[in-house]
Amino acid sequence: MESAKATHMTTVALVESNANPKGVQLVSTYQTNRMGDPSDLVELAQQVQKADDFIRANACNRLTVIAEQIRMLQEQARRVLEEAKRDADLHHAACNVVKKPGNIYYLYQRESGQRYFSILSPKDWGPSCPHEFLAAYKLQHDMSWTPYENIEKRDAEISIIDKLLNEQVALPSCHEPNFRGLTN
């Protein structure tokens, strides 16, 4: 019956003996060339095996972190592509006014299927709203669109970035992140 766990043989490399390297005796040949206790070799082999195991475990742990970062980056890339498609679709919606960054626009759909932007909200229309209201968006200065329900969060993010750019013109000389003043 074969063992389920494969036996791994560890090879221990010992220092080659040279009694007089370059003509100089550096160490006692008696101490370095004598046959020692066989348990010393076993202990050396165990130490090398333990080091191999730790190196493998550390490499696996680091690769696991990298794999998780790759998954996160793939998810971010997917979101970026979805947002870019949404933004492009919204920029192609019909609109009879010049859209200006910083303003909120309301997306409606006619019975014909045409989608269009208006500056009038459903509240402005009241009960006489002529078409189906789809969503509201804020046009950002980078020409991206922020859904109405995310405007506060996005504005807070932009505020923090503005604060960072305005208050920390030069990067601090320390090697640690400096978030002083950003959260107050």
UniProtKB/Swiss-Prot annotation:
Protein name: Uncharacterized protein C1orf50 homolog
Organism name: Xenopus laevis (African clawed frog)
Domain of life, source organism: Eukaryota
InterPro entries in UniProt: DUF2452
Keywords for this protein: Coiled coil
Coiled coil: 63-89
